[in-house]
A protein has these predicted regions:
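Structural motif
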Residues: 1-2, 21, 88-91
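Single conserved hydrophobic/aromatic residue that forms the stacking wall/gate
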Residues: 1-11
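Mg2+/Mn2+-dependent nuclease catalytic core
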Residues: 31-135
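Residue-level preference for beta-strand/loop junctions
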Residues: 3, 25, 38-40
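A short linear-motif detector with a strong N-terminal bias
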Residues: 8, 24-27, 75-79
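Short, conserved active-site entrance elements at the starts or edges of catalytic domains
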Residues: 12-34
Length: 136
């Protein structure tokens, strides 16, 4: 338990300068969301202004630095949260932010536009629901 607390403190200490500089008004943290049409639910890490733009902000840890191409599922997930939040609040979120802290303390910031990933979200959901229907 002590090691876990120390690791969490390290992550917090590494992220703090980024958060102090870039984060603005926080709309929610660790909030349960759902989407009636998509029939999905989840718990978003944070919805806040990032560099002045309302954003879904997701925090990740990694053993090593990540290539942008490795993050596609994270972008799809964050886009889903943006859609869920919009359905619940009628506030549109166009920007998604993934913050990754590696074991050596490196912080990576990936900022994307939600619309780039909505077709992939639709594709993933269609594949899932087709699997559920067919039982395969």
């Amino acid at each position: 338990n002590r090691c876990r607390r120390q690791r969490q403190m390290c992550i917090r200490d590494r992220l703090k300068p980024y958060l102090d500089e870039c984060i603005g008004l926080v709309h929610c943290q660790e909030k349960a969301l759902w989407h009636d049409y998509y029939k999905i639910a989840g718990r978003v890490d944070c919805i806040a202004e990032w560099d002045g733009v309302l954003s879904v902000i997701d925090f990740k840890t990694s053993t090593k630095e990540r290539e942008d191409s490795w993050n596609e599922n994270y972008y799809i997930q964050a886009s889903a949260y943006a859609e869920m939040y919009q359905e619940r609040t009628l506030q549109e979120i166009e920007q998604i932010v993934i913050l990754v802290v590696t074991e050596d303390g490196t912080v990576q910031e990936f900022v994307k536009k939600k619309h780039q990933y909505l077709h992939l979200l639709d594709k993933e959901l269609n594949m899932y629901y087709n699997t559920v229907k067919t039982g395969i």
